Amino acid sequence: VSGVEISLNWDGVTDKLPEGIRVIFYPKDGEGKKVDRYLSVRGGEMKVPPGRYSVVAYNYNTESIRIRGEESYETIEAYTGNCNGLGITGTEKMVWSPDSLYVLNIDELKIDKSEEVLSLDWKLESVVKKYSFAVEVKGLEYVTAIVGCINGLSDCYHIGKGYGASSSQPIYFEVKKDGNKVVAYFTAFKQAKEMSVPTRISESRSAISRGVGDIKLILRFIKTDNTVQEATIDVTEIIETLEDAGIGDDGKQEPPPEIELPPDDKIEVDKPELPPN
């Protein structure tokens, strides 16, 4: 068994370090044996039998992200669970926004039989993107709550293969009223490196067509009489502009980018027929 010393560098990746890292060595062609360890956020030493491996590393103990398919490099993926427990009709089909996920994947790494420890310097990459937006809405005085979701962004991430995919589950987010606008912040997994649109997964989870998916923001306005009015905004063309600018030079959160709707598409919440009791 050979010693492998892993050093993790977080410079330029994040200031908020995760709790720790899980590293899995998957043997290729039956050479070697699967090794699965939890390391500190700075890394650590692992004992790995000589052989050829595919490797993944990611931060564990995330709040909303779960892992499935961890039996192989090809199948391991991150996803988020359904929004049960919100008590709002329709949200149980939605999934939570992912929290921070940092990932490294190596297709092939050869571990030789050696007395000397092999040193590996790794830098993980963030695979969750932040988005925000503001949009003007008329009639907000009739609204008691707003449920938001985005359809068509990546709701899962293939850690070994290194790309996000959409299984057509809407990602839920909270929407707040701010004067005559509504404002929201949400996250989704990164798409594949070379594509700006997510890969679509078929129901059988096998055939994958990399077709352009429409990306839609859906806002559901719950009114004072408990009726619901829905507005859909197609953001396929502008999704890149909604990527969160983050914190400005003055240390303040940048204001969310405004979505300019054409005059015919302005969102207006109709006055409820019944006065609230």
What is the predicted function of each stretch?
Residues 33-126:
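Short, low-hydrophobicity acidic/polar segments
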Residues 22-71, 144-235:
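Tryptophan-paired
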Residues 109-116, 178, 192-194, 238-245:
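Solvent-exposed, conformationally flexible loop/turn segments
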Residues 1-13, 268-275:
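Bacterial Sec-dependent N-terminal signal peptides
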Residues 7-18, 134-142:
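Structural motif
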Residues 95-183:
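A sequence/structural signal for flexible, mid-protein segments enriched
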Residues 203-277:
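Hydrophilic extracytoplasmic domains
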Residues 2-6, 21, 51-53, 129-131:
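Short structural boundary motif marking the start of a folded domain
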